Amino acid sequence: QNECPWKPWC
């Protein structure tokens, strides 16, 4: 998925 789940805009 995303490599930065702590960034909702990633």
Curated annotation (Swiss-Prot):
Gene Ontology CC: one annotated term: extracellular region
GO molecular function term, any single one: toxin activity
Residues modified as Cysteine amide: C10
Residues found modified as 4-carboxyglutamate: E3
Keywords assigned by UniProt, alphabetized: Amidation, D-amino acid, Disulfide bond, Gamma-carboxyglutamic acid, Ion channel impairing toxin, Neurotoxin, Secreted, Toxin
Subcellular localization, as worded in the UniProt entry: Secreted
Record PTM D-tryptophan, positions in chain: W6
Cystine crosslinks: C4-C10
Tissue: Expressed by the venom duct.
InterPro entries, A to Z: Contryphan_CS
Primary location class: secreted
Superkingdom classification of source: Eukaryota
Record function comment: Its target is unknown, but this toxin may modulate voltage-activated calcium channels (Cav) or calcium-dependent potassium channels (KCa).
Family: Belongs to the O2 superfamily. Contryphan family.
Domain notes: The cysteine framework is C-C.
Name recorded for this polypeptide: Contryphan-Ar3
